[in-house]
């Protein structure tokens, strides 16, 4: 906030915006808005942040939108990459319920090959994100027990959502010495 440049305390924009949104939901100011349909259909491939925004905007323009998601839930990085202590997943679920009530259809566990898109749509939006992390070309990278941040974060978020993993699939750091490469937000999230 620019107020900090004038020796004043900066405003808490994020917190203020969140408080306004929460107040709007608690006071029932947020209502379902079903637009007049234009007769066209759109398939959105990927239900991460970009796919959800595209679906919402297209829906409000009158398109009948169907969202295809490879995983068991929508949200992408919001759901699987951000720890619960930073983003309560009920916020995502609340927004998804609103999108569904406004007419957006979600189809989960759908692996879509972009060379074989589902038939019957007038247009397509491909917003699959990037499931591939940037690999480190360092000695030992191929050893057992070396993981990318999103492997750990995604699994932890899924465990907190009630999913179970076999012992062989589980990324378990308990009782181990752990080295996190990178001190940014993602590295800190892994430590958290």
Cite the ranges covered by each PLM segment.
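N-terminal juxtadomain amphipathic helix
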Residues: 7-21
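Residues forming the flavin
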Residues: 17-192
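Local cysteine-cluster metal-coordination motifs and their immediate loop/turn environment
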Residues: 2-6
């Amino acid at each position: 906030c620019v107020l900090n440049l004038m020796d004043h305390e900066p405003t808490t924009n994020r917190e203020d915006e969140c408080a306004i949104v929460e107040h709007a939901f608690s006071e029932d100011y947020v209502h379902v808005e079903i637009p007049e349909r234009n007769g066209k259909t759109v398939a959105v491939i990927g239900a991460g942040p970009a796919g959800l925004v595209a679906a919402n905007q297209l829906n409000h323009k009158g398109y009948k939108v169907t969202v295809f998601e490879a995983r068991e839930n929508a949200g992408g990085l919001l759901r699987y990459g951000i720890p619960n202590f930073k983003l309560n997943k009920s916020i995502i679920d609340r927004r998804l319920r609103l999108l569904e009530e406004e007419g957006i259809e979600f189809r989960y566990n759908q692996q879509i090959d972009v060379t074989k898109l589902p038939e019957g749509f007038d247009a397509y939006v491909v917003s699959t994100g990037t499931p591939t992390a940037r690999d480190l070309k360092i000695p030992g990278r191929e050893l057992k027990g070396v993981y990318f941040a999103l492997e750990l974060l995604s699994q932890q978020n899924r465990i907190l959502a009630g999913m179970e993993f076999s012992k062989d699939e589980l990324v378990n750091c308990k009782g181990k010495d752990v080295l996190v490469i990178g001190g940014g937000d993602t590295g800190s999230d892994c430590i958290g």
